[in-house]
């Protein structure tokens, strides 16, 4: 009997680390993008929670009138927010070491920049990690491509818009009511509801919701029953089974008769491509619209566009919207300036459509 002895090939610590990072056998895939993603998102989340709970007021407008956003200073979950960096900081990079003290850094809204920068890099790495895992598993890369839509939207409101407006103080606050305030001010200053790219985003989000509900309900309604009436139809499905789980012919026939024949997909691949494409393209265009409005290429303006033969303005719905925009604009940053730019420059603009009659 002959025994063969073979020395095990030694694997360096670095090779073991690389194998662990890139292994698809882990319960949670890490990947090289994950090496950056996990610490970035954990750091952003940690400081967001601390700032949301305990950050002192921030001089957002740069006029020595701090605005409180944390729970410790009287806010609740709805009204609380991480307040954007001060207008006195502008677009300057403002890490902790650039401030004279921690108190100054907090007063000027340093945590906002900290959270936003780490968050944007973190979600970008998450997108890269999606691609990396798809690559390791031999899948196509469209999951990461779809995720690029919300990444683009977040980048637009947290980075591109402040760059275009010249200050991080114009970025979206990190809170519920702060988000709504950002939306109202954005409408007032850029007329976003009249921008075609925003309209495409609305069609993408609401259309995507409609198509998702239609698809899910059609599939659920055309499941191939493998069980008796006394047990759930779900019990007839086995993970990884070769047989189809629903009858696409039945779903196609139902929907084709409900609307018309060519409104229904007869190809599962083209159907799911459409379901992915519609909302993604819509949100891409919304992000693109936000990025153009950041540099004041605003929504369509039809104010005072209808006049009579004497040149007098005939008010339209566009003029009603314009009046609402002016009202929203004069309410925000009320102490930073006496009048909004639309009222402080140019010719006098009437804010009432018709003058009230006195003693009539």
Curated annotation (Swiss-Prot):
Similarity comment: Belongs to the reaction center PufL/M/PsbA/D family.
GO cellular component term of the entry, any: cyanelle thylakoid membrane
Descriptive protein name: Photosystem II protein D1
Binding site for Fe cation: 215, 272
Binding site for chlorophyll a ChlzD1: 118
Lineage, broadest ranks: Eukaryota, Glaucocystophyceae, Cyanophoraceae, Cyanophora
Feature type site, description Cleavage: 344-345
GO-annotated biological processes: photosynthetic electron transport in photosystem II; response to herbicide
